[in-house]
A protein has these predicted regions:
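An interfacial alpha-helical scaffold signature
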Residues: 1-258
Length: 258
């Protein structure tokens, strides 16, 4: 089949056609098609999605898609990402005509989104706490010590009940502290950038058991350096962190480009 369709990676604010000469999915040449001040990053493709029964092949395709977006962040000072397998078909018109029509019809929404993400990328921040240290601190608190003291000299049944009460109280105090830590980190980072979201962890490994909070933030270089400096001050105080990015800001454009 001929390459009558256009595979679209994302949108940048360029305003003119450019033969970008970046290698996209399956080595396809990526170029831009422009309308109303915005340019779509595209390659020519068939009118069908990229499919494979091999999960590793699909993974490779998605990685290639995301690499184009990562390069676009640096080259065009930002990118409005579109999902893997976004394909514009020709229908009764050419695929290029349909794409330009879409850019024109969505100009106002694209302007709003671009103002939000220009010069910024999405970063993932995972903050961990020292669970053993926290349990030790809570266990040594006056409230828990009083319960333990009351166990002395008591019968086996009452002693067991008091021991269970102590464990329950340790968990309650511990979770209160964890939630307090989480709120404090969130509030402090929000002072740097209002664009942040708590996201569920998709990693299930032993090391994740002490995950305090998993955040996605939209930030420019100055903002992320400030956040990194703040987090580095917390190292050694029972906390550690991992910072990844910048990535295409999927978490912050979902509603704007729908």
């Amino acid at each position: 089949m001929p390459d009558d369709a256009l595979y679209v990676y994302g949108i940048v604010k360029l305003g003119f056609d450019l033969d970008w000469r970046e290698a996209g999915i399956e080595g396809k040449n990526v170029y831009t098609i422009s309308e109303c001040g915005f340019s779509a990053l595209v390659h020519d493709c068939e009118e069908k999605p990229y499919m494979s029964e091999d999960p590793n092949k699909i993974k490779e395709l998605i990685i290639a898609h995301n690499k184009i977006l990562d390069r676009a962040i640096n080259h065009f000072d930002g990118v409005i990402p579109l999902h893997f397998n976004t394909i514009i078909k020709k229908g009764g018109n050419s695929s290029q005509y349909n794409l330009k029509k879409w850019l024109n019809n969505n100009k106002e929404r694209l302007e709003k989104t671009w103002d939000k993400i220009k010069g910024r990328g999405e970063y993932g921040i995972r903050i961990y706490y020292d669970k053993e240290k926290l349990i030790e601190e809570v266990s040594n608190s006056e409230e828990i010590k009083d319960i333990e003291t009351n166990r002395e000299g008591k019968g086996a049944g009452l002693s067991y009940l008091l021991q269970s009460k102590a464990k329950t109280k340790i968990n309650e105090i511990g979770w209160d502290k964890v939630n307090g830590f989480k709120k404090k980190f969130y509030d402090d980072i929000k002072k740097v950038t209002a664009n942040l979201k708590i996201t569920p962890s998709r990693i299930f490994i032993d090391e994740e058991k002490d995950l305090l909070v998993n955040l996605s933030v939209l930030a420019d270089n100055q903002q992320i350096n400030k956040i990194k400096g703040f987090l580095e001050q917390k190292i050694g105080n029972g906390f550690s962190f991992q910072l990844a990015g910048p990535f295409a800001p999927y978490s912050f454009v979902e509603n704007e480009t729908a």
